[in-house]
Amino acid sequence: MIKQRVFAWTDTYDIYDEYGNPKYFVKTEFFNIGHHMHIYDMYDQEIGVIHQEIFHLLPVFEVEIGGRTISRIQRRFSLFTPRYDIEYHGWQVQGDLFGWDYDVYDGSYCIAHISKELFRWGDTYVIDIANPEDEILGLMLVLAIDAANCSNNSD
């Protein structure tokens, strides 16, 4: 579960496991062009970075783990609903991205289901990831899509 703080000078996301225990946290750099997020475990060890590539018509994000770029997420042009291309082993996003109820697939295998909880103070997202090995990348994908949606809304 991801919870965004409502009143903060920088965006901070607290990420909890299925039992409500803190598992990760995300810090967003404040004075940057484009989004730049660092994901940490509870021992303050950085586990990944998401940064927005600038000079693109639509939002593009690179996902780095261990200093290596492992994925790229790009918003595609679409008239009515947001669509994304994910450059990672054929992963695809399907569902209602505006309503925050969507799935991430690898072929026909559902990797993750993402939904937004309503009537909460601040944005709260629930992420169900089927395989623990996909947890970090699945989490980073959700954060990048959230940032891309925010980028488009502020344009």
Q: What is the role of each PLM region?
A:
Residues 1-155:
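Intrinsically disordered, low-complexity proline/glycine-rich segments
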